[in-house]
């Protein structure tokens, strides 16, 4: 989908059924969920029960829209799970203990921050700054600093390989990228380092914090 979106001709319109963690196109979301359900559940005799992860601070209207879309896609029962709880369980964290655990789950459209204890949420919030926003800022930063146009996938690779946050104060990784020079219009290669991306990454991280 990412490759098609980057090279889409004029007669194809790209649609994002989910945006910032919530439904933006109800019809296409239903179609998307239908495909997912059919891939993993082949029985047509009994409708499946479906669990869906949602942002911690999702509104009642937004959660109702999720349930409605999944039911319309063929589910007989829908369970909504807060994304921080799902992230904690997936990481092997025991949230049933009385001591609090802070979970920061940076998704594609939203970042969920929650304090979990005794199997539930003590406090939670969602910030609509997340992975996709990092990609956009890295893309713009490379464009402005190097006069190079890169694609969304290259920006995402820079985020994962160079702009990460390991537990090493002197971390400074470098990655060679290929793009199109805005000055000559020709293909060009440059090396981008962790320190090069400090500004856009910190700007968004401060918004989350």
Language-model segment annotations:
Residues 109:
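Conserved Rossmann-like nucleotide-cofactor binding loop
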Residues 2-106, 114-209:
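Nucleotide/phosphate-binding catalytic cleft detector across ATP-hydrolyzing
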């Amino acid at each position: 989908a990412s490759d098609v979106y980057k090279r889409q001709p004029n007669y194809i319109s790209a649609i994002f059924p989910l945006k910032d963690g919530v439904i933006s196109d109800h019809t296409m979301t239903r179609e998307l969920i239908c495909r997912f359900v059919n891939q993993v559940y082949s029985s047509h005799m009994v409708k499946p029960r479906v669990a869906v992860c949602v942002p911690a601070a999702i509104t009642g209207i937004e959660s109702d829209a999720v349930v409605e879309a999944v039911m319309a896609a063929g589910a007989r029962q829908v369970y909504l799970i807060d994304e921080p709880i799902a992230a904690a369980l997936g990481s092997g964290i025991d949230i049933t203990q009385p001591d609090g655990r802070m979970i920061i789950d940076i998704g594609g459209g939203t970042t969920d921050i929650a304090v979990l204890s005794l199997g539930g949420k003590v406090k939670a919030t969602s910030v609509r700054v997340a992975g996709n926003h990092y990609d956009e800022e890295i893309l713009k930063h490379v464009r402005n600093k190097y006069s190079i146009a890169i694609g969304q996938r290259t920006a995402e690779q820079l985020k994962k390989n160079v702009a990460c946050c390991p537990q090493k104060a002197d971390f400074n990784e470098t990655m060679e990228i290929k793009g199109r020079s805005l000055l000559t219009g020709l293909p060009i290669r440059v090396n981008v380092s962790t320190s090069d991306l400090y500004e856009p990454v910190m700007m968004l991280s401060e918004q989350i914090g």
